[in-house]
């Protein structure tokens, strides 16, 4: 059969070949994206409050509480009648 030295040599060569054949640059092929979480139990709530307080956008596509144009500016542009604000002709 095979001696212990031959078996160990074969295993060493096989492991070495498998190691070098499967090695690929991790940072170039598959970047690691880690989900950022707060450490506390209220991490999601704290994150939402931080985002709103610093003027960040809200999640899930909702608009922020301060629109780009105020109602007073819209009245000045389109007149005092509110019925034609969104009636573009």
From Swiss-Prot:
It is found in: Secreted. Its main location: secreted. The keyword Signal applies. It comes from the Eukaryota. The modification Phenylalanine amide is found at residue 60. Each flp gene is expressed in a distinct set of neurons. GO terms for biological process: neuropeptide signaling pathway. Keywords: Amidation, Cleavage on pair of basic residues, Neuropeptide, Secreted, Signal. Residues 1-23 form the signal peptide. GO terms for cellular component: extracellular region. Residues 24-35, 64-89 form a propeptide. FMRFamides and FMRFamide-like peptides are neuropeptides. Belongs to the FARP (FMRFamide related peptide) family. This is FMRFamide-like neuropeptides 27. The lineage of its organism: Eukaryota, Metazoa, Ecdysozoa, Nematoda, Chromadorea.
